[in-house]
């Protein structure tokens, strides 16, 4: 006898007639007049539960099996048999069943076998992994995570753990969470009356990071190809389906690379990850296609078979101005493209994923390499049909004099970035990288539109429960 996951049974990893133990939670119980109960038991290893066929000959049939309800945890031992019913190849003829945990009051169990709105489930984030939709999201999220790590490992990248606490603002936007151990009821003050951060834990102001990019650049300029994959934070007071205060970012950095190099890297990474989901998680994708967004499978298959289009920002603006469409936000050179502009380009004009390159410098960050025209920077966004921007990246500014000029233009203090400037003084090299918002990727793959439903415990304005 061996411990078996539900997925391993369905994959045929246990021979018909072999005895296995499956551990999980009851989704439903159905009793027949012939004295047999049918338990649908799931363990999270795959979308479908396994059917346990439980005869009334078991010693605990009357006093336990017939009292099982949704949410009870069980340990079932039995023989693997071919299932005569439709929908699954195998089931378990149960010879022994142990109840590991009961549901106190089945009538008030929040995850009883009924359909819940996705909004209601957010209020029960500790229980929502038990639902079909959130369980499927979790498996797809894991599959994408593993695929991304696998991709970079196979491409010779080194994973770098960048700090979550920082004194640098990568984006220069100022929307950062402050980290402090000062007594808020008795703040130390300087002679000028300002908060004296010299008395704080780090001896200066410190924040939760908005990006691991600047730190990753330092490692790329020694190890050639690196990436980060971890949480980032934005104190942006936006209560929308597209914003989180805490989210995960994938950020590769490559030495001796230009904008075209990382555009190619972005395409290869996305296709690798999507192929992994199509190969490994078709059961979950089928659920999403049936109950969330009927286009998800076709969209991913189309994505991986499409060549990425490329267009300069200036040409993209001209396309949008001449397309005959009236947009909610008018298009002019110098604006940041909105979601409606991005989606028109990807879905209607190019009908494929598209890389928009060379944006106006005034709408981009200080670290992006200034182009020869003096007006644009070597920045890019990857736009995907169905969602718009999914990746943002750039060639980094490797010239110290130009970097200092850009810092001054954006009213940023050179001294705050002394170590970042040092990299341009000691063997500087052209280098480039991008950032992928991981939750946006999960949302795109699953069709689950609200970003709060693709991360286990969402953090947003006035939302920090659990």
Curated annotation (Swiss-Prot):
It is found in: Cytoplasm. GO terms for cellular component: cytoplasm. Signal peptide: none annotated. It holds the Pfam family tRNA-synt_2. One of its GO terms (molecular function) is asparagine-tRNA ligase activity. It catalyses: tRNA(Asn) + L-asparagine + ATP = L-asparaginyl-tRNA(Asn) + AMP + diphosphate + H(+). CDD domains: AsxRS_core, EcAsnRS_like_N. Keywords: Aminoacyl-tRNA synthetase, ATP-binding, Cytoplasm, Ligase, Nucleotide-binding, Protein biosynthesis. Transmembrane segments: none annotated. GO terms for biological process: asparaginyl-tRNA aminoacylation. The keyword Cytoplasm applies. Its EC number is 6.1.1.22. Homodimer. This is Asparagine--tRNA ligase. The gene is asnS.
């Amino acid at each position: 006898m061996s411990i078996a996951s539900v997925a391993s049974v369905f994959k045929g990893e246990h021979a018909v007639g072999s005895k296995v133990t499956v551990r999980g939670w009851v989704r439903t119980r159905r009793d027949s007049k012939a004295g047999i109960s049918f338990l649908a038991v799931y363990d999270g290893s795959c979308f479908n539960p396994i059917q346990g066929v439980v005869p009334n000959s078991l010693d605990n049939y009357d006093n336990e099996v017939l009292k099982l309800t949704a949410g009870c945890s069980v340990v079932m031992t039995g023989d693997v048999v071919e299932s005569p019913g439709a929908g699954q190849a195998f089931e378990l003829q149960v010879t022994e069943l142990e109840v590991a945990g009961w549901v106190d009051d089945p009538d008030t169990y929040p995850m009883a076998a009924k359909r819940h709105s996705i909004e209601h489930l957010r209020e029960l984030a500790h229980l929502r992994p038990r639902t079909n939709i959130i369980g499927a999201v979790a498996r797809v999220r894991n599959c994408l995570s593993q695929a991304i790590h696998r991709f970079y490992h196979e491409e010779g990248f080194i994973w770098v753990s960048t700090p979550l606490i920082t004194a640098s603002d990568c984006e220069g936007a100022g929307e950062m969470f402050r980290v402090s151990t000062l007594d808020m009821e008795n703040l130390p003050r300087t002679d000028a009356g300002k908060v004296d951060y010299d008395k704080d834990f780090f001896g200066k102001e410190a924040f939760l990071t908005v990006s691991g990019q600047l730190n990753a650049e330092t490692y790329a300029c020694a190890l050639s190809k690196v990436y980060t994959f971890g949480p980032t934070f934005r104190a942006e007071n936006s209560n929308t389906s597209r914003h989180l205060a805490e989210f995960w970012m994938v950020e590769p950095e490559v030495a001796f690379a230009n904008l075209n190099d990382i555009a190619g890297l972005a395409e290869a990474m996305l296709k690798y990850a999507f192929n992994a989901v199509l190969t490994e998680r078709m059961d979950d994708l089928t659920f999403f296609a049936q109950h969330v967004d009927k286009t998800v499978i076709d969209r991913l298959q189309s994505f991986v078979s499409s060549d990425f289009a490329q267009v300069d920002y200036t040409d993209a603006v001209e396309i949008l101005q001449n397309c005959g469409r009236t947009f909610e936000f008018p298009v002019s050179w110098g604006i940041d493209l909105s979601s409606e502009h991005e989606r028109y380009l990807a879905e209607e004009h190019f009908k494929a994923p598209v890389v928009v390159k060379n944006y106006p410098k005034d709408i981009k960050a200080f670290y992006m390499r200034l182009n020869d025209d003096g007006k644009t920077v070597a920045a890019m966004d990857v736009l995907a049909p169905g969602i718009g921007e999914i990746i943002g990246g750039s060639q980094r500014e490797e010239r110290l004099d130009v970097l200092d000029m850009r810092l001054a233009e954006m009213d940023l203090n050179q001294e705050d970035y002394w170590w970042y400037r040092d990299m341009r003084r000691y063997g500087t090299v052209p280098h480039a990288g991008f950032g992928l918002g991981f939750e946006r990727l999960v949302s795109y793959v699953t069709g689950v539109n609200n970003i709060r439903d693709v991360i286990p415990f969402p953090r947003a304005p006035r939302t920090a429960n659990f």
